[in-house]
């Protein structure tokens, strides 16, 4: 996993509350286990009409929001079933940071495990951040837990364990591999039955 220290990017705004994992990526696209290729199906039923033409009224389809890597959204983001495909779709689309009023617990952990930073922020702060010009680069500094725009500076908090994993680009496998020598020594010592 790539370390996450400072991210600079533009933001897309989708302030709906209770966006569930089926709205993030509909179930018909979950027939694969690869982590890539899901971005084109992100918010599929909102982004496209029945003939797969972009819905011009959907915020992510606005020309000045294309290529955004920060998503500012409502409360309880990622609720519903615990499909890891939802964070995969967000990451594959290009999002590195999701800022919401809150997250479903499993979705929150899945974001972290996939190298994305989910940030919990109150509504007033999110509304200020959402007013940032669509072309402005927003800086998200994980180490100092600060989001900076040209006019505002917002502080956020993150659990130390998750912060360290993201800063160092560690997933479960790489953490396990830090103990490779100890594991080999243990395997050498145990009796074989």
Curated annotation (Swiss-Prot):
Keyword DNA damage: no
Record-linked CDD domains: IPMI_Swivel
EC class name: lyase
Superkingdom of origin: Bacteria
Molecular function via GO: 3-isopropylmalate dehydratase activity
Pathway involvement of the protein, from the record: Amino-acid biosynthesis; L-leucine biosynthesis; L-leucine from 3-methyl-2-oxobutanoate: step 2/4
GO cellular component terms listed in the entry, alphabetical order: 3-isopropylmalate dehydratase complex
Entry EC number(s): 4.2.1.33
Keyword Lyase tagged: yes
Catalytic activity of the protein: (2R,3S)-3-isopropylmalate = (2S)-2-isopropylmalate
GO biological process assignments: L-leucine biosynthetic process
Residue ranges crossing the lipid bilayer per the database entry: none
Keywords on record: Amino-acid biosynthesis, Branched-chain amino acid biosynthesis, Leucine biosynthesis, Lyase
UniProt subunit comment: Heterodimer of LeuC and LeuD.
Family: Belongs to the LeuD family. LeuD type 1 subfamily.
Physiological role: Catalyzes the isomerization between 2-isopropylmalate and 3-isopropylmalate, via the formation of 2-isopropylmaleate.
Record's protein name: 3-isopropylmalate dehydratase small subunit
Source organism: Bacillus cereus (strain AH187)
Taxonomic lineage of the native organism: Bacteria, Bacillati, Bacillota, Bacilli, Bacillales
Gene: leuD
């Amino acid at each position: 996993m790539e370390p996450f220290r400072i991210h600079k990017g533009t933001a897309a705004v989708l302030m709906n509350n209770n966006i569930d994992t089926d709205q993030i990526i509909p179930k018909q696209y979950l027939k694969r286990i690869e982590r890539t290729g899901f971005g084109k199906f992100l918010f599929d039923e909102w982004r496209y009409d029945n003939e797969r033409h972009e819905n011009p009224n959907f915020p992510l389809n606005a020309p000045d929001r294309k290529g955004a890597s920060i998503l500012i959204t409502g409360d309880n983001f990622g609720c519903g079933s615990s499909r890891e495909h939802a964070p995969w779709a967000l990451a594959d689309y290009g999002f590195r940071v999701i800022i919401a009023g809150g997250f479903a617990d499993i979705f929150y952990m899945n974001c972290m495990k996939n190298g994305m930073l989910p940030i919990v922020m109150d509504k007033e702060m999110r509304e200020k951040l959402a007013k940032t010009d669509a072309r402005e680069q927003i800086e998200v500094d994980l180490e100092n837990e600060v989001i900076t725009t040209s006019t505002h500076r917002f502080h956020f908090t993150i659990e130390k364990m998750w912060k360290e994993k993201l800063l160092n680009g560690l997933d479960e496998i790489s953490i396990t591999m830090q103990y490779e020598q100890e594991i080999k020594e243990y395997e050498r010592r145990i009796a074989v039955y």
